[in-house]
Amino acid sequence: MDKKVVVDAAVVDQTKLDPVTFEVLRSIFEYASDRMSTVLQRASFSPILADMVDFSNAIYDYDCQLLSQAANCPIHLAAMKFSAEAIIRRYGLPQIYEGDVICVNDPFQGGTHINDMTFLSPIFFEGDLLGFAVSRGHWMDLGGGAAGGQAFAGTHIAGEGLRLPPVKVYERGVVRQEIVDILMNNTRRRTS
């Protein structure tokens, strides 16, 4: 996750951003994060995502440093970085490919609670990994002892529902149907 780069001073001086270029780039990243949110909200069948806006979207660089975030539910943002880092630890950067979509909801791997599902997609340009688009949203149900996974009498995390380590839902642009089936078989509301 720590990409080591050796740069001489002359190159650094040539690559300094002037304020106008910086603002243009900042605006582009902000627009991309906000657009991610708009698409997620409009495409969602879940009232928690569509109406309550219990989700967050962000763009991180190669080192998982935040570049931009959408202005919806910022409470997720601090932990989203740790989920992204857990995904990278699990697969390693060389095994994360264009077209991959990787999810995780394990509270011990950067999650907040089981119902908050994080999805990471790598961002490539001309074959080089530049960063990651990351979304975290509250799923209504992932199994467990009670609908919604919040059983008041629960004594173990297993009672909250399906706990996923980082797993590829799409690999190189191809859906892994067995993972989708696991997710769908562990919810009471298949459309949420």
Region annotations inferred by a language model:
Residues T38-V39, A43, Q65-L67, K81-P122:
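Conserved mixed alpha/beta core segments that line enzyme active sites in large multi-domain catalysts
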Residues C73, D106-G110, R136-D141:
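Acidic, glycine-rich active-site loops and adjacent beta-strand->loop/helix elements
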Residues Y60-D61, L120, F124, R136:
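Core beta-strand residues in small-molecule sensory/regulatory alpha/beta domains
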Residues E126-S192:
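Mobile "lid/hinge" segments at catalytic clefts and subdomain interfaces of large enzymes
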Residues E30, D34-F45, Q65, R89-G92, ...:
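Generic secondary-structure signature for well-ordered alpha-helical cores
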Residues I75-I87, M140-G149:
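A short, polar/charged loop-to-alpha-helix boundary motif
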Residues D2-K81, E85, N185:
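Long, charge-dense accessory insertions within large macromolecular proteins
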